[in-house]
Structures are given as C-alpha cells and as structure tokens.
Amino acid sequence: MTDLPKIGKPATNALAIVGIDQIEQLSSVTKSNLAHLHGLGPKAIEILEKSLLELGLSFSLVSPDLPELPFFLIGDLACDNAPKRRIVRDLAMSLYAKGLAYDGSLMVDDVVYRAPYSNLVLIGRDQVVSGAIRLTDISSIEVFQILSHGKEAALHGKIVDKQGTLTYFSMFFVFASHKKDSAVSQIMHYQQT
C-alpha cells in the first residue's frame, strides 16, 4: 500500500475522515463522487489521479446502478445479485439527501417511518418523502454494511457534514413481501451525533 501524495492538509483531512489514507483505496471511488467530498478541490483530485496512474490504477468507473448524489458516498455499495440491498441503499440515500428529487417509488402507499430519537412517526408515502430527516450539508456518507434476508433489511453507517460533525445512523426496513422487487412497508431510523 502507498501513502497518499502531498495534496494539502484540507484534502488529506477530508480523505482521512472517510477512512482513506492509501492511494490504492481510491481505485474503488469514482472521480465524480470524490469531487463531492468537502475539502477536496480539483488540484488535489488531479494529483491523486496522476498518483493512481503511476501505480497502474485509475478511479473507478461509474456504477450503473448507483444514483447520482450530491455528496461523497463510500462503503458497502455493491448490490450484485441482491435487489433488496439496492432498494435499501437507494432509499436510505434518497431519504437523507435534501434537494434530491425522489418520488417514493420504493415504498408502499401506506409506509410507516419511525425515528424514535426525535419522536417522529410518518405514515404514508407523501409524508415520508416530505417529512423524513433530510440533511442539507452532507459532505460524505460511508455505508458500513447492508444486510437483507427475507422481508427484512438493514444498513448502518456514518455521515460527515461540511463542518466535520460525525453522525452515526442505522435504518431497518420491512418489505411488503418476500419478492425481490417488493416495496418497503416500514422504516425504523436511528441516528446519534
């Protein structure tokens, strides 16, 4: 493994916050996704790209099943042949990303969303889409793990805002049926700053 090149303290710190301290780790990240990371400018990205090329590596290509997001996303993102993992990943990111157009299509009409840490209960797709916890200043989200089995799924991770504040979160999902393309009927959401 090779240490990161000199890219300036803000850029190095931004990468450290999301757990990147070796140049090889960047081969699993897209260049456009990296640009969303607060503190990492075009000059630093150019230097990182040159360092990757020197090692015979490059930034990752865009994953065709990953939605375009206004923040840096890293972690357990591959959904391979697990459609419910993709649904959970995409729904969680859509609920967090303020300003991201989302129609609620991954949820049933009478979905129930609970956030016990804020005593919030929302019932119905429209209420969840408009009232779920959405953050405006997300710099990055790291998904630690996504699990799915039968009618249930869960994911947990870490959010870093543009001020550097860390928020740990987890979401638990219940699907309407066991079918692979089933919509979500219940969401339980926890987070701690």
Predicted regions located by residue number:
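A solvent-exposed, acidic/Ser-Thr-rich amphipathic alpha-helical stretch
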Residues: L100-H149
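Short, low-complexity N-terminal intrinsically disordered segments enriched in polar/charged residues
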Residues: S63-A97
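A beta-strand edge to alpha-helix "cap/lid" segment located at domain peripheries
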Residues: L73-D76, V129-T193
